[in-house]
Amino acid sequence: MRDWFFFPAALALVAMMVFLAIRPGIGALPSGAVAGDGANYNKIAIEGDYLHKIFAGGNAKTELVDGTDNKTLLYIEAETGALRDESELGPHFRLAADIEAQFSGMTVRITVRARPADDRGAMQIAMNYSAGRVGESGWRVFDLKPEFSDFSFDYDVPRIEGDQGVDYLGIRPVVPNKSRAVLIERITLDRTGPWKPEDPA
């Protein structure tokens, strides 16, 4: 076989093998833990296709849907009694180790922009920031409005003790009966500064 034929053919074969290897990732939606950019951790935003990083947990249903103005929304639906109290056992975002380290000992403002789903829309939404075994915010419940609105709470993230665990942000509709669903447009985590221990009484 002449070199003028062999080398271009070999190069084409290698290129095809590389393409076939990376093809499953082309166009794939983001998944896994939410991570920062390595530079600015004062504001972490989860929106658009990145809402796909949610873990359904329990028997909840989660999916991305198209909203108005070409916005990608997160749909979360659950049935009554289907979800346990722990954040990680229901719909939740897992926060990567870099965010956990950057948020340790900081006050973080969690803001979720949400509204009831068009069908079986929830009247309330519940959110919980869990820092694993060192503490959690507890479930914060908000009354939803017909239109997209921001719902926020502040949480003093405990300082890391020992080995790093995993932080979670749980988000779910409040389900008094049957099933309920919410639509999420955006989630932001704002690091507002270090919290100070309370003075002893």
Q: Residue spans of the language-model regions?
A:
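Beta-strand acidic-aromatic groove motif in beta-rich domains, primarily in extracellular
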Residues: 119-130
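Trp-centered recognition loops
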Residues: 107-109, 113, 145-153, 182-184
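Extracellular carbohydrate-recognition regions
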Residues: 6-67, 196-201
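Extra-cytoplasmic beta-strand recognition segments
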Residues: 95-120
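Extracellular carbohydrate recognition and processing domains
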Residues: 134-165
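Extracellular beta-strand ligand-recognition surfaces/modules
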Residues: 153-191, 195, 199-201
